Amino acid sequence: LKEMGIEVDDAPVEEKLPFKVEMPKELTTREAQEVLDTLIEKGYLDADYQPSKLTGWQRGVLAYEIGLYLGFRNIWVVMATLWKSNPGTLRAYYSKSFNEDKAIEYSKEIKMLIR
């Protein structure tokens, strides 16, 4: 981003939050921070890295796409830790997305943003 003339805050993610969030180590990389910041900018996450007005299945798809892109070994645990959620619930939300007509388009939308 710096190469494109966009100002980048180099402070660690944890220092930018107004409250203490348990930030999984998988999300402390520069690449992960850029993904999270993009999702905040586009309104998918709030300033505290929490889902912003998303349905359950949208949270599941978002968690899956973030984890897949960043190569997490355990997507559900990492994202549930950040979002103060239960890994099993988050995974169930993702499974529920298979019943949603809009899920494929939503998944494509997320992929376009984070890649």
Features from the language model and the residues they span:
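Flexible coil/loop and intrinsically disordered linker positions at secondary-structure junctions
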Residues: 1-115
